[in-house]
Structures are given as C-alpha cells and as structure tokens.
UniProtKB/Swiss-Prot annotation:
Gene3D superfamilies: 3.30.1360.40, 3.30.1490.30, 3.30.230.10, 3.40.50.670, Histidine kinase-like ATPase, C-terminal domain, Topoisomerase II, domain 5, Topoisomerase, domain 3
GO MF annotation terms: ATP binding; ATP hydrolysis activity; DNA binding; DNA topoisomerase type II (double strand cut, ATP-hydrolyzing) activity; metal ion binding
Cofactor note: Binds two Mg(2+) per subunit. The magnesium ions form salt bridges with both the protein and the DNA. Can also accept other divalent metal cations, such as Mn(2+) or Ca(2+).
EC number per UniProt: 5.6.2.2
Active site (record annotation): 835
Keywords from the named record: ATP-binding, DNA-binding, Isomerase, Magnesium, Metal-binding, Nucleotide-binding, Nucleus, Phosphoprotein, Topoisomerase
Name of the protein this chain belongs to: DNA topoisomerase 2
Record gene name: top2
C-alpha cells in the first residue's frame, strides 16, 4: 500500500515464518499511561482512549431523544460528536448512500466472462469502502515503480475481502509526536494522511485523510498487515466493531527481505441493510478489479489467486467495446494513443449517446469531469473541422457531435479535487492538471477517417429532412405571401395536372411571359420570376437551402413534398414546369441548375414524361423580304451564314436576351407553342450521372475529362421533338462551362485572357500612346469590345496589365502612371481607378507587331467586330508574364520566365540547335530559385545574421508580400496561440520596391532559429510547381502542357506560320503599290505627251478610255486599323439594303483621276518612276528573306529595347536600396556578424551592362536617373541617325529598339530586312510642352511611348499616316495635336518658330486621346524648307478633296518621312494651305 497515498489507511497481515518480538509489560503500561494522561488533558474523549474500552454500537453513538412531555433537554439537543461518531451518523457525507440503489452500470459477468452493461442494485457506501482500499493499493505503484503484483481475494459467503500489493511497505516505527506506530496512526485515526502538503505535487488517489479509515469504521473486523524491508519487521494489527476496539500490534522479525501491504476486512453488512455480499455487489467489485488490470501499468492483477488476462489500457478498452457489441456485429474500432506518462486516451464511435470511461489516479470517475471534457472537446473539435467541410445539411453543434463519441481516459492529475468524498467527478481546473494531453495529428486523423463523420452527417441529414419537411407544399388552390407569382386559375384544383408553371429569368422576362398569356389564357399557365441563378443545391448547405427564397417558393408553388417519390403529377399544384431563359450561356446554366435541383431533391419527377419543359426564343433572326430565318444557337447561325454568302442580302437582328423581344414577338411565340415549347425526355440512368458530374464538386476530375471532349461549333438541335437530358448537358451546358474556362484560362499563343485581350485590342486600335484615366478607359473598352461583366472587373484587368512590381508582370503591356499597387500588399493597395492613368507601354508594339494585325481572326459579337481570337506576339507571353486562373473543372498556374532566356531558346529553335533549360524568373527578384524536383522549384528570399541576436531580411519569396512578413514579425513580437514570442524588436527600412527588415530576436528565439535555419524560421522559402500548366491551344481546345518546352514548341509553330503569312501579305501589298506607282507615272506621262486628254470630258468617258489604254482599276487601300472590320460590316449592311453605289469603276480609278493638277508635271513623273523602282527593290529584298530571318530581326529589336528597360530598372533598384542602407547607417552603424546565407548580387539578370551598373552605384555625385525626363516613344526610337539600306529602300537604325523602319506606317515596310548602320548620332528633341515639363515622373517603369518616330533620311518625302479624301477619315479626334503650325510659315521662316493655330473645340475631341504635339513629336535638325530646283520630289501636302486650309483641320504627320525639311520638322505638325490640291493616292502621303 502507498504511504504517500494515505498512510492512515493501512494495516497488514503477511505469511511466512518470523519471530515474535517480546513486548514488555513496562512498555505497554507506559503506553497505556501515556494515553490516559492525554485523555485527561483533553476536553473530549479521544479515539485511542475509547478504543481501549469495549462498547456496543448503541453505547458508542448517543442518540438525541425528547422527554415524554415534549420538552427537550437543551444539553441533549446540542451535541458534539467524535469524528468516528460523525462518520457513522452521517455516512452519506463520506461514503455515499448506505441504502440500496438501482442504476445501470458496467459490471463483470462471471458466467459469460465479460463485462456487461445492465441495471444492478447495490449499496454505494459498500462499494466505496472497497474502492478506497484498492485505490490505495494501486497508489503504491506511484511511490514504488517496482510494485508488480496486486491480489484481491473475495469470499462473499464468509463476508471477507482482502487486498494485497507488493512493493514498499509502511514504515514500522513509532511516530515521534503521536507516540504510536505509524500503521496504527494511519489506519486507526481519522484525518491522518501523508497528503496534506499542498506544495508537494502528488498523483495519488488519497487526499483528505479519510480513505481506509472509512473502511475500518464500517467493518466488524479490519486487519492491517505490512512488511518493512528496511527495518526487517512485519506488523499486524486488528480493529473490531467499527474501529471501536483494537488489538495490540504484533511485530515480528523478517527472516528474509520482503515488503508488502495487505488489508483484510469484514464489512458491517448490518450498516448497509444487507445480510451478505450479493451477486450484484460481487459483479461490481470484480469489474473494479478489472479496472485495475487495465489502468495500473506493468502490474499483474489477481482475483481469487487467478490472474486477470487484461494487460494495458488498450486491451481494457477493447474488452469494454467487445462486451458492448452484439454477437453478430463487429466491435467498434479502437483508436488508442499513449500520449505521455500521465495520459492514455482511446476513442471509439458511439451509437448516438456520449459515453465515457475514465480514471484519475486509478479512481474510477464514473461521472467524468474536467479531464473527460478536456479530451472530448479536442476530439470533437477535430471531427467538427471535417463535418463543417462535408456537411451540406442541417448545421451540427459540438454537443451533437459529442453524442457520437465514446472516449476512454486514464490519467494522473496532481492533487486532484472531486465533487465529493465519493470521487465520482473530477473538478480540478485544466490549468492545475500538472500536465497536458496533446493529441497527435496521427491520432486525430485516424478519428477523422473513422465512421464518426459519417454518423454525424447521417444525423445532420435526418435533422435537415425533418426541417425541410416543415415547408412541404400541398394541393392548395390559393397561395399567399408570394406577390410576384402570377398563379394559374386552375392550379391546386382537380385540373392542376394540366397546369404549367413558367419560371422566367428575371422580372422583365416575367412581364413578357404574362403578355404571351393573353394568347393562351391564364387558367392553365402561371408565371414566377427567378432572381438571378438558382442555388446549386448539390453543393449547398442545409441552411442555404432552407433560407433560399427561390427554392422554397418553387417548392410551395409546385406543391412538392420532401423525399416523396412521385409516379404521377396529380398531387402537385402544377403538372408541368417550364423554364424560360435567355438563349445564352447564362440561360443554359440556369436550365442546368433547375434540372440539378429536381434530380437532387425530386428525381422521380424527371422520370415522368412531359413534366419538364423549356421555352426557346430566337437568338438571331434573319429577314429578307417575307423570308424569316430564326436561329436558337450562335453556332447554328454561323453554319448557316457560311453556307449563304456570309448572310449578304439578309437583315440580321441579334436578340441579346428575352428583353430584346417585344410583346408582339412574345405573342407570336405563344401562338406557335409547338415550335417554342420543347419537352425534356424522361431522365435515363446515365442522365443522373451526367447531372452529378456537371454540378458535384467531388466530380472535378471527371468534369475535366468531359470538358476535354468539347469542340467549338457544337450546338443543341432544337428541331428535335424532345430534348434528351444528356444532349442538353453535352451540347449546351458544356458551352457555359467552357465559357467560364475561356474567361479564366489564357491562350498559349498570346498569354492573354479574353478580358485582357479586349483591353489590348482597344489600346492598339486607338494607338493609346498618351495616358488616359483607367476608369474612362474601362468604359471605352467595355463599350467597343462587347464586354459583358461590368466595368469594375474591367478596371481591375487594366490595373493588372499595368502592374510591374516584383512578382507581377515581367513585361507590363500598359504603363502604371499612378499608384497601381506595390509588392507591399501584392497590388491590393492600388488607388481607385479614377485616380489612375495608363497608356501603352513602349514594349507593347515591339512584342505585338502591327504588321500582324491584318492577319488575325477577328471575332464578331452581335454584329460588332471585336478583338481577335488571339494575337501572335514575337514571344510566348504566357511564359513571360505567367498565368493563373480557376475555371470550371480546370485551373492553371504557369510561372514567369526570363524574356532573354525565352529569346535565346527561340533563336536556338530557329537555328536548329538544342534548347537550354529555363528556370522561373521574376523581374527585380534577388533571391534564389532552385529546382528541387522535375516539376517543382524552391523560391527563397535572403536573410543574413548581422549580430549576435540580429538578422537582416532583404528579399522575400515570390508572392510573400512585405505586409505578410510584417504581420508574421508582429506575431513573433507579441506572441500568439500558434507562434510563441521570439522577437524583441524589428525595424523596417524598405521603400516601394525593395525589402529591408532588421529583426532583433530573443536569445532563445535566435537559438531556435539557428537550429531550424533562419530561412525556415522566417518562412523565407516557398515551392512553386509546374505540374498544372493549362492553356487553350491555337485551335481553342483546352490542353495541359507537361513542360515549358512543350509551350515553347507549340508557340514556335504558330508564330513561324504567321511570319510566312505576314511575308505573303506584305509581298502582295508591295505589288499593289508597284502597280499604282507604275500606272500613275504612265498616266502623267500620257498627259504630258498629249496622248491622253482629261479636260472637257465626262468622268464615265474618261473611265472607258482608261480601260482601253489598259490602266488597272485599283480600289482604295485599307488604312487606319489595317482591317477595319466595322467599316466592312457597315458596307455589308448597305449591300443588304441595296444602297451600294453602282459606280464601282469610278472609285477604282480615283487613284488616277483624283491626282492634283500640280502633280501632272515632269518632276512628279520622274519621282513616281523612282518610287516604283524603290518598291521593286524593296519587294525583291523581301522575297529573298525567309520567315525565320524576319523573326530574328524582330528578336534583335526586342532585345535592344528590353536591355534599355532593364538598365533603368537596375539603376532604380540600386538607388532605392542604397537610400535605405544610407538611412540605416546614418542612424546607427550595424556590425556584421555571421552570415547564414550568401547575399545575391544586386545586378539583375537580363541587364545589358554590369559595368554601367557598378559605375552608377559607385558614383554618388552623378544625378539620379529618376530626375531624367521620361522618354517618349519617338525619343526612344530616334537616338541614332538611320541610314538607307544598300540593297533596298528600308531605313534601319542601330537604336531602333522596336525593329521598325521609317516606313512603318506604310504597308511597304519590311521589318525583317537588314541594313548597315553608319549614320551620325542625332540629338533627341529637347523641347517639352511647358505643362509636361514640370510634371515628368522619375523613370520607375518602362518608358512611356509616343505616336511616331523621328528619323533623318537621305530623301525627304512627306507622308501622312492615312490617305483618304473623306473628312471622316481624318485623324481621329483622339489623336489630334493640341497645337497646329503651318508648313508654309516654317518654310518662310527658317529656324524660326512657326505660327500656331488652336485645335478644334473640346466638343469635337476626346480629352483622353489628345496627342500634344510638343511631347509626341521630336524636333528635327534644321535644313532648307524649300527643295532645290533639281529635287526629284517636291514637298507633298496632306491629300483631301476639299482644301484642307479652308476648314483648318489639323492633320497629324509623322516627321520621320523623307520630304520633311529641317525647319518644318522643328514644328510638331502642319496644316495644308487652301491653295494646293493633293493627290489622294500619292504614296508620299
């Protein structure tokens, strides 16, 4: 027995041969005398004194009585009892009730040899006195780990119970103060214990000094026997009659070392109202002995000298569960964990009621307590995590989850507190346990994978069904509370099965449906509008369904009954459900969601033929006279259009939605219901699987494969009498899913998503080289590109295209003029769009060459020509800027790569060389990117130790934003539940683009950080995978790319084919120009020689004569936006209406007949011959070039421009970092300590010159590049003097970063031709608009572009960027210069500033697209404005039918063309005087 547990509780008996030590009479007398003397001094008798006398039980416990007269004796009324008397008088306070009690509990069935949970009748007090002894025996294991045996002997017939344990015995010596033996002290005297020192933390069962004394008091005989190996003595003593009498202790010597404690007692059954220990009591005691076998570690437990087979807590739990399982069932799986030396925990799934079996310091806490709640709450929380994710039914609370938990706990608690002396419930606070029970992830994961989650979800489903049943409809003729319902008159009556409920897409569609009801009547048709899209009930939670107004309204209107299986529709208020939505992708989705709702909730209804109907309306109507063609899908219309001369001669009307139809249209639809009402076929078995595949989240992988089957052009055939559900899903619903993917996943060719492509298209179309507000640009883009998703979304798209901080775009196609966001918050800190301005980046047109624009496949949306299917840039932009998006069934992530690496690999491919391995690369990132697996990279920031407890962080992993790091440091500074405090302080020294934290750690924090590495501690590494690179290929099919090389190869093939097409187109255009120059020269020559007379002749006669003389008819060349599709469409509409002019021949010869009179000269003739030869030379040179050579030329141009950009970025980064370091150094000089990593050099990969970088960094006196004037596109491209090519008339410059010649705006330009570079350097224009001069911003982004390029060439030729004789073809208002100067004035005032004229009124212009002449066009060097007499080419002016100077229309001219002399080039633009006519087809224009 344990002396630590409760020495007051033990006396012993042992077996063996030993000598009886003589106890002298003297000593006995001394002992007696001493006891008597103490008794005399005491005010009341002491237990030791009373124990020496023999008394009956009635004599020991005086009773309070009243006299016969009813007058009480005050002295007998108020009494003081001894502690022993109080225990006997009030036993419930100490041992619980002494009356028989019936309750259900676990007992041991000896016949079945297993535990059994049943109702038993027992006396709690008797059970308690036995439990006190056996717990003390178990406590000895704590005091002496060598204890390995515990024996219990139970003899109900003889009414004897004995409990034996080996291990350390009770010291056999006399107590110094009490002068009696310690065994007698602790077993025969109440309130004696070894557990009163509260400063000593103990994990034993004894606590209050009662324990075994209670057993002694309620026994007729109580024997203590113990052996003390240290003193080689054995002690035995007996108490009788409820501890009222005792024998003298018998102390003998041990023959051999031994130690044990044994208690034998005979319960006073009379006190418990019993005459013997009955079977129920025996079964309880036996179960308690089994408890000890399971909870006392490494101890053999015997019952009546037979060892119990249970060993260990897990086996004990399995015994419990096996006993609780029916014979034909498998017992619940036990999930067990030995947490630590003080905690053993096991879990099993319960049957709907929380169960627990628990022990505290070997005490059976049958009612649980704080220890059980502590463990159970942890388990419930873990289960709740899974349930919340998977439960779509009724919400489940923690206590409801707990009902499915069965927990077993065996723990040791320091100085435990209980609710009473019966110790059934632990009340100790968790904080005072003295240990923690931290359940491992493995243990909790095993619980999550068990059937407990399934059981909880079943409960949630049952609860949801019960709640949903409350809203069941019925066959009611009148429904209230749904004001938007237009109810059928016969709904809910005996004719309800004939009624049709029309569900419309919105209120406007409802009004149209109601107007149609005037044709068919209101008796059998009802209408109810849906607000937006119906809820996806398959993925919705119970509360979402219960609170969804549309779902509940449909259920109420139709009269649905939850969980009912329908065989007919007679019990419904409506026998049919008809869907009326727009014939677009969203309308298809709504139909699918309604089908999904019915299949998920009432699948039997879909098996009833004719129950579900859809109402179809045309999406396009084509009319020609009395003929009408209606189309219900766009692909169907496209097929018809291709087969019918592109729809020429037909009037085409697009019906965007039901709102486009008017009331007359709707009445006509309802007049022909057989055509417009399409019944769905009864649902087949495979249909249910398809519906689940389309809408269930868990079917994502299957949905991917389904979407792979999509082929553009498929459509729903509405000529069928019935629509199969599988056809609807595979032909119509799939188009909605693909539309979602198309919005979210980029093209592999241009790397753009549709929204981004719309922005790029509009900016190219408007040549947006001057900034405009983002908010306004978003409106323009949405309007002109048929964008259907709101301007806010478009504004964000524009902002994303312009962002250039680390981790965003490697090449931003738009300029971020304003606060477009920084790496501090990953761009989320961008200003509102109304404060932001943007324009095209100079690199945009280098990457997206304008010569490709006319080769693209432009799309048409409802008759409006919009962006192409994809652009074909010279680099795969999907690799340059990466991609990320989530669609339907598919998501994508493609990292950014270095444009220089991409360019190098493209060169290798063009030259037939092997490719180099490419690693992800982010512009401005200075950390490291390391390949750790074939499809995985590790991205690391930079951290260095700069002091004993100090570190410096100068780079973060990609997309680990500065604010994220700051929040992590804050958490480490104050400490949180997940992060212990390990930081003393930190400082921030970073600017907009760089990262710089100085962090001071605690001593323990630094030690911990170094142990696990600074990189890990500060989360400075992340992984990036290339295993999900998804994009649309050139054919519009979604495709997964296994490697970067796969993307590069596919792009290479598409791009090379496009170069071949570009060359063919340019050759064709040069041939046309050659024919025009040749015919114009012959025309002038014939007039000069008198072979052709044009005066005094009618135009039609002249045309006849021109045909006779074999002059070629040449139509006006397309201009402006290369392929003006909108104009083409307008012409097509005119053709349909029969308004096209029949004088086509007149237009075809305008290039001759519109030539100005002054051009009919010999000089002009010679000039045209020369131009013809130049075009021929250019054509010959172009024909010799291969597509690969054209591509290589463009790559050269890009690399030149890219290097300039990287140089600017490099200088800015160096300056920003140096600024932060200078500030730190000025504040306090920081000594450098041990470095845990190598700092990356500050130079950025891709920089053209590291020497220049070093020089810039070291020169403190050199002015910052941020003060330099922002470079315009003209300045960017005009830094060196060009020279005409030796073999063709193409101008090239060494500084031509765009790879564009002076001829760029003319179709003859060939970017693929080489030329020698030998011109003199030419100064950029220094003139800046006074307004712009003071508002230039530091060069922090790619330099801003401008609308033209200035060049000095050998032959001056004036050229405009367009050639049209119509006023509508003048330069768009958005491109008109703000200041117009006269060429004439320039010519007369050499070197002097020309007079200026004001531009047109603001009403005629769009402010956002004004090109200020001073900033858009650089000044040219000075030469004579007047051409010499022998000049082959006089100055050519802007062509127009009307004298341009009369209306003073400002004409923008690119000053790079040859006819411009130096004085005129000093002016930014010019107008044509009214006394000159110009040739509408002069190539110099």
């Amino acid at each position: 027995m344990s002396i630590d547990a409760d020495f007051s509780d033990y006396e012993d008996e042992a077996s063996g041969d030993e000598n009886v030590l003589p106890n002298t009479t003297t000593k006995r007398k001394a002992s007696t005398t001493s006891s008597k003397s103490r008794a005399k001094k005491a005010s009341t008798p002491d237990l030791r004194q009373t124990s020496l006398t023999s008394m009956t039980a009635s004599e020991q416990i005086p009773l309070v009585t009243n006299n016969g007269n009813g007058n009480s004796n005050v002295s007998t009324q108020y009494q003081r009892l001894t502690p022993r008397e109080h225990v006997l008088r009030r036993p419930d306070t100490y041992i619980g009730s002494i009356e028989p009690t019936t309750s259900e509990m676990w007992v041991f069935d000896s016949e079945k040899n297993k535990l059994d949970y049943k109702a038993v009748t027992y006396v709690p007090g008797l059970y308690k006195i036995f439990d006190e002894i056996i717990v003390n025996a178990a406590d000895n294991k704590v005091r002496d780990p060598n204890m390995n045996t515990l024996k219990v002997t139970l003899d109900p017939e003889a009414n004897v119970i004995s409990i034996y344990n080996n291990g350390k015995g009770i010291p056999i010596e006399i107590h110094d103060k009490e002068k009696i033996y310690i065994p007698e002290l602790i077993f025969g005297n109440l309130l004696t214990s070894s557990n009163y020192d509260d400063n000593q933390k103990k994990v034993t069962g004894g606590r209050n000094g009662y324990g075994a004394k209670l057993c002694n008091i309620f026994s007729t005989e109580f024997v203590v026997e113990t052996a003390d190996k240290e003193r080689m003595k054995k002690y035995k003593q007996t108490w009788y009659d409820n501890m009222s009498r005792k024998s003298e202790p018998v102390i003998t010597s041990l023959k051999k070392p031994d130690e044990y404690t044994k208690i034998t007692f005979k319960p006073d059954l009379a006190k418990f109202g019993m005459d013997k220990i009955d079977d129920d009591m025996v079964s309880i005691i036996k179960r308690r002995i089994y408890d000890m076998a399971g909870t006392v570690r490494e101890t053999k437990v015997y019952l009546n000298n037979e060892r119990i087979s249970i060993s260990g807590f897990k086996k004990y739990v399995e015994m419990y569960l096996a006993s609780d399982t029916k014979p034909d069932e498998e017992p619940p799986r036990v999930i067990y964990e030995h947490v630590n030396d003080r905690w053993d925990v096991a879990f099993a799934v319960s049957d709907g009621q929380f169960k627990q079996v628990s022990f505290v310091n070997n005490i059976s806490t049958i009612r649980g307590g704080t220890h059980v709640n502590y463990v159970a709450n942890k388990i419930v929380d873990a289960i709740d995590e899974v349930v919340k994710k998977e439960n779509k039914k009724a919400p489940v609370k923690a206590f409801q989850i707990k009902n499915y938990v069965q927990v077993f706990v065996n723990c040791q608690i320091e100085n435990p507190s209980f609710d009473s002396q019966t110790k059934e419930t632990l009340t100790t606070k968790v904080s005072a346990f003295g240990s923690q029970c931290t359940l491992s992830d493995k243990f909790l994961k095993a619980i999550k994978k068990s059937s407990v989650v399934e059981e909880v979800l079943k409960f949630a489903t049952a609860k949801a069904d019960q709640q949903l049943s409350k809203g069941d409809g019925g066959l009611r003729s009148r429904i209230t509370g749904l004001t938007k319902l237009e109810d059928a008159n016969k709904a809910g009556t005996k004719e309800s099965h004939k009624c049709v409920l029309i569900l419309t897409e919105g209120d406007s569609a409802k009004s149209l449906a109601v107007s149609g009801l005037s044709v068919v009547g209101r008796d059998y048709y009802g209408v109810f509008p849906l607000r937006g899209k119906l809820l996806n009930v398959r993925e919705a939670s119970h509360s979402q369904i219960l609170n969804n107004k549309e779902i509940q309204a449909i259920k109420k209107i139709m009269g649905f009954t939850h969980k009912k299986t329908y065989t007919d529709v007679k019990g419904l208020r409506y026998g049919h459900l008809m869907i009326m939505t727009d014939q677009d992708h969203d309308g298809s989705h709504i139909k699918g969601l309604i089908i999904n709702y019915l299949e998920s909730s009432y699948p039997s209804l879909l098996q009833i033929p004719g129950f579900l109907i859809q109402f179809i309306t045309p999406i396009i109507k084509c009319t020609r006279g009395n003929q009408v063609q209606a189309f219900y899908t766009l692909p169907e219309y496209e097929y018809w259009k291709e087969a019918n001369n592109n729809g020429r001669g037909w009037k085409i009307k697009y019906y965007k939605g039901l709102g486009t139809s008017d009331h007359d249209d709707m009445k006509s639809y309802f007049s022909d219901l057989d055509r417009h009402m399409k019944y769905f076929h009864a649902m087949q078995e495979k249909d249910a699987e398809l519906i689940e595949m389309a809408f269930a989240k868990k079917k994502a992988d299957v949905r991917k494969e389904w979407l792979r089957t999509y082929r553009p052009g498929i459509y729903m055939d509405y000529t069928q009498p019935q629509i199969p559900i599988d056809d609807f899903i595979n032909r119509e619903l799939i188009q909605f899913s693909m539309a979602d993917n198309i919005r979210s996943i980029p093209s592999v060719v241009d790397g753009l998503k549709p929204g981004q492509r719309k922005v790029v298209y509009y900016c190219f179309k408007r040549n947006l080289v001057h900034e405009t507000k983002v908010s306004r640009l978003a409106g323009y883009v949405a309007s002109e590109t048929a964008y259907h998703h709101g301007e806010v979304s478009m504004e964000q798209t524009i902002v994303n295209l312009a962002q250039n901080f680390v981790g965003s775009n490697n090449i931003n196609l738009l300029m971020p003029n304003g606060q477009f966001g920084t790496r501090s918050e990953g761009g989320k800190n961008a200003s509102a769009s109304r404060y932001l301005n943007t324009a095209l980046s100079p690199l945009a047109r280098v990457l997206f060459n304008s010569n490709d624009d006319q080769l693209l496949n432009y799309q048409n949306d409802e008759g409006q020509w919009i962006e192409p299917e994809y652009y074909v840039p010279i680099l795969p932009m999907v690799l340059v800027n990466g991609a990320e998006g989530i669609g339907t069934g598919w998501s994508t992530f493609i990292p950014n790569y270095n444009p220089k690496d991409i360019t190098a690999n493209l060169r290798h491919m063009l030259n037939g060389e092997p490719l180099e391995i490419m690693t992800p690369w982010y512009r401005g990132f200075r950390g490291s990117i390391t390949k750790v697996a074939p499809d995985r990279y590790k991205i690391s920031g930079i951290i260095n130790q700069i002091g004993e407890n100090k570190v410096e962080i100068t780079e973060l992993p990609i997309r680990f934003w500065t604010q994220d790091m700051k929040e992590y440091l804050e958490a480490g500074l104050v400490g949180t539940e997940k992060i212990r405090k390990f930081i003393v302080d930190y400082e921030s020294h970073h600017g907009e683009g760089n990262v710089h934290f100085n962090v001071t750690l605690t001593e323990a924090g630094m030690k911990e950080a170094l142990n696990e590495s600074l990189e890990v501690k500060f989360k400075l590494s992340r992984t990036q995978a290339t295993s999900n690179m998804i994009a649309f290929d050139a054919s519009g099919r979604i495709k997964k790319y296994d490697s970067v090389e796969d993307i590069l190869t596919e792009f290479y093939e598409v791009r090379l084919r496009t170069y071949q097409r570009r060359k063919e187109h340019m050759v064709n255009e040069l041939e046309k120009r050659f024919d025009r120059f040749s015919n114009q020269a012959r025309f002038i020559h014939m007039i000069i020689e008198g072979e052709l007379v044009v005066s005094k002749k009618k135009k039609k006669d002249l045309i006849v004569e021109l045909k006779e003389k074999k002059f070629q008819p040449i139509s006006k060349p397309k201009k402006g936006h290369l392929v003006d599709l909108e104009v083409e469409n307008a012409l097509a509409e005119e053709e349909q209406s029969g308004d096209v002019s029949q004088d086509e021949d007149s237009d075809a010869y305008n290039y001759l007949l519109s030539m100005p009179l002054w051009s009919l000269t010999y000089e002009r003739y010679v000039e045209l011959l020369k131009k013809k030869d130049e075009v021929m030379a250019e054509l010959d040179a172009l024909i010799k070039k291969t597509p690969k050579e054209l591509w290589l030329h463009d790559l050269d141009a890009f690399e030149h421009a890219w290097n300039k950009v990287m140089d600017d970025i490099q200088r800015e980064m160096l300056e920003e970092e140096q600024s932060s370091r200078d500030f730190v150094n000025r504040t306090k000089k920081k000594p450098r300590g041990k470095s845990t990593g190598t700092r990356k050099p500050r130079a950025i990969a891709g920089s053209s010159s590291s020497t220049a970088v070093k020089k810039e960094a070291s020169s403190e006196s050199k002015p910052s590049t941020t003060n330099r004037k922002q470079q315009t596109l003209l300045e960017f491209a005009a830094s060196k003097e060009p020279e005409k090519s030796s073999d063709i008339n193409i101008v090239k410059t060494e500084d031509n970063s765009h790879g564009l010649s002076v001829e760029e705006n003319r179709i003859s330009k060939s970017p693929g031709l080489d030329s020698s570079d030998s011109g003199k350097s030419r100064k950029r224009s220094q003139s800046v608009d006074s307004e712009d001069a003071g508002s230039k911003k530091p060069v922090k982004k790619i330099a801003a572009s401008a609308s033209g390029r200035g060049r000095k060439t050998n032959k001056p030729v004036a050229t405009t960027i367009f050639s049209s004789d119509d006023e509508d073809d003048l330069l768009p208002s958005s491109l008109k210069p703000s200041t117009i100067t006269s060429t004439k004035a320039s010519a007369k005032n050499k070197g002097k500033k020309a007079s200026s004229v004001k531009k047109q009124s603001p009403e005629d212009d769009d402010d956002d697209f004004i090109i200020p002449g001073s900033s858009s066009t650089p000044k040219a060097s000075s030469t004579n404005a007047e051409p010499p007499e022998d000049s082959d080419s006089p100055i050519r002016k802007r062509p127009t039918r009307r004298a341009a100077a009369t209306v003073k229309t400002p004409i923008y001219v690119d000053p790079s063309f040859d006819s411009m002399d130096e004085p005129s080039m000093q002016d930014d633009s010019f107008i044509v005087d009214n006394d000159e006519d110009v040739d509408d087809y002069d190539e110099s224009d």
